[in-house]
């Protein structure tokens, strides 16, 4: 097999050709510093402003509420530290057991500094219990930080309800929307979100660019000091990547509905045909409320890593969980939180993207069926069956 089938779009996405084309002039000719007072710099600053407007529109935000960062992890940490700076007398934060590593690891670090962190549990389908959230709130709570959609199992969480709970208790609400942008309709005003993080490389823009939305009436103390971004994020602006991210947002506004309808069709076709061709299959997550492109699927008796490695020999690429944890020999913290039987059902994560086709699905099903049957046969022979 020569052509590549890439089914790991929750890890990263291919940069859109239109995005690349929009960026190139800012590498070659339009390389001025946007902080310069001469026209060569001012023109660049105006283009940055246009990108800011496009991203704001994607979130139903105002452009003044958009801060460019280097990545979503920076945005996440910035949002958390700002909440702490805004509430110096409080020491309690509420998050979940299934957040991205940049949230979880920041919370662990804060625990060493005397903060009290509540990690909300999930059920075996990865669903939150909002009663547990309400019961966890105290007078000492300074922040609720909950993701909009999970990167491993695809669950979409009830952000509007969570935002309302936070608002009723006058608690800041941060949302990691990295996996949701482009797949879920986001309205920061309607959802009562105070701060929100997103990443360029999950929406066909380049790696190395992110956004932090900060509600305009919220006092903001930067993580990185400097005069750029109206004193909210220091460092010379990454102009080409900002332009590329703006173009990606523009494309999403045009294509989002059509792409998601097609991705959901392809994902459902994939799962249906897998279950028709392979026995003892388990799909993780909330199947009624999940991203249209994501399937966390396991095959009894076969490790997800084993399937991944054999598929790679066919030029097919899937994930086994978060790409940010893939080098660690540890089980997925998300699936552990779901009380998953990882000994028998260790999953692969299939996350489709806009460049995947129905032919990709058909080719994948044939090869996957053979791979699973082969691995099971080898295991049976080893066990003397």
Predicted regions and their residues:
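Pyridoxal 5′-phosphate
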Residues: 1-385
